[in-house]
Amino acid sequence: MSSNKPYVIKGIPVDAGQIIPVRRDIDEWYEDTSRQSRIQLSIFIWALREFQSIDYKDRLSYFQIAGIHHFPLITWDEEEPPVPNKPGYCVHNNVTFPTWHRPYMLLFEQRLFEIMETTIKETVPESHKQEWRDAARQWRLPYWDFAKTSGPHATGPLSLPVLCGLANVVILNPANPETPIELPNPVYKYRAPDLMGNLDKPFHIPPERIDPDKDDYYPWDKCQATTKYGLLKNNPHIQDAGQDVTKSNLALNEHPWYRPNKAGFPPLQTLTYEVHRLLSFKFSSWGAFASTKWCNEENKPPASQQTRDILSLEYIHNNVHNWVGGTDYLGDPSKPDLQGAGHMSSVPVAAFDPIFWLYHNNVDRLTAIWQVLNQDHWFDEPHPSDAKPDDPLKPFHVSKDKYFTSDDARFWRKYGYDYDIVKKPGTNEDRAPEEVKMKINQLYGEPISRLHEGQPVEYDYVINVIYDRYALDGIPYTIVFYLHLKDGSYKCLGGVYTFSTKLSDAQDTERGGCDNCREQKKAGVLASAQIPLTYTLYERQEWHNLGKLLPVKETADIIRQHLCWKVVGVNNSILFDSEQPMRGDPATWRSLDVTAAYSEIHYPVDRNYKYIDRGLPAYHNYLPIHLSPT
């Protein structure tokens, strides 16, 4: 059992004057056959298995550290032993979204390193200890670059890490380092000692309500193991429902939004394009980049010039959670290939799935990239309700008597890790911005290179949406956008997943959302997201017959006349339809505001208008597209 003293998060130590090791791309690391990487993989797998086997009542167990994210809503690393913690620690829809998760990743990384050190001390033979110790000190928790395509010229599909799809994995045996051993893979899933709803109070995991009107719940309490797309209402195999990696990969590439008819079209993956835009935009402030939180005077809809502040890191993050885990517990007949629900799609239990840690490491990496390119933005232009940079990031301790703050978390290198994309080779300093931009283009620039037609000025089209993530009292839902064409078909443009959970009430305190969510609902705080249309319209020219250049008047007319949207519940019901605005309960959706806009794109080009890969596009002066009344 761990000590009751505060657990101080310092990161993996680095000797003075030494180069700080980098967190590596997990697929590149897994495929690296060098001796050091093979040892690192082996000690990582061994340590993660040990971590997951620690008694769930131990503060430093995998179970309790994963539970910080939400369920089981107990205190962690506070003065008293774990007790029910109705306030929770949630920071979603909040400007501290990236900074709160930074020490969270550090905590996980540090715990694994501590277990590695113990394993080397107690298990590895003396003749191999130094080699394994050196490899462990160079190890850092890898990241999953969810927007990096595979194949030549980055044109292949997106996919989960290879390691996440292996039920078993072969490593070097720490007790006999020259001998391979095959073990159940702890990155594949987490398995609790019993059904999570049967664990002793206050550690038990409850079900999660997914329907505001009916008693439909995600049965997390009946799960012993995490799953991806494994839970279906009429499927009795809940305890260990499996990892349908094929569905996760399909969702990452097809983006399985609700489709009101089955007139399909080839999958169009837009995640890579959105990440490139995120890192290209000149946001007005840190908060605009960091969070979906939408606060302005009286929550008015965004003016066109604010369009560049609607896209955010958190919006992209929310959708990927949905695609990796799956939300279709009831089974939507319009998408049979993507039925099923899993832990990653749910705020309360996402962190129990081991892929969560690889995934959020990449969210931290994207934050670091943006920080290097935007060093003049840090909690600037705050709204009065925004968290301050010196507010505590509970429950993480930076010292025995002080919680982390965002200011503490701002500079990542002092915690013993770095990322290659932002690190000047051979130093502990930033790369030059031009070199970072070149790497962004190499990793995520393929869609934008297809869009650039060698013209001095081209155009960008977007949908901006302001929504209330608590409209269903926190129960998650999706807003899906379409072009409803003259032939009656609906062409899907994209969507927004709220990644939220039901707020608690007096009768249901153990299952509900946190204080942050309740306070935001009470204050009327909204959320925002942006659906980029340019790449979709370019790749789907057969929808509009306008050609590749997407002339402004004609393109705006199509958006104005044919854009529509539906709000879809996790139970697959249509909760709001812009073409039938009186359907359902209009009052619930009165704050939902959809606007469209266009702007010029100025590409970084030479005198022959050839794209310069050391620059990023500039998006200028958005103007409104006035939508036709429904």
From Swiss-Prot:
UniProt-listed InterPro entries: Di-copper_centre_dom_sf, Monophenol_mOase_fun, Tyrosinase/Hemocyanin, Tyrosinase_C, Tyrosinase_Cu-bd
Cofactors, names only: Cu(2+)
Annotated SUPFAM superfamilies: Di-copper centre-containing domain
Highest taxon above the source species: Eukaryota
Function: This is a copper-containing oxidase that functions in the formation of pigments such as melanins and other polyphenolic compounds.
Family, as annotated: Belongs to the tyrosinase family.
Record's protein name: Tyrosinase
Organism encoding this protein: Aspergillus fumigatus (strain ATCC MYA-4609 / CBS 101355 / FGSC A1100 / Af293)
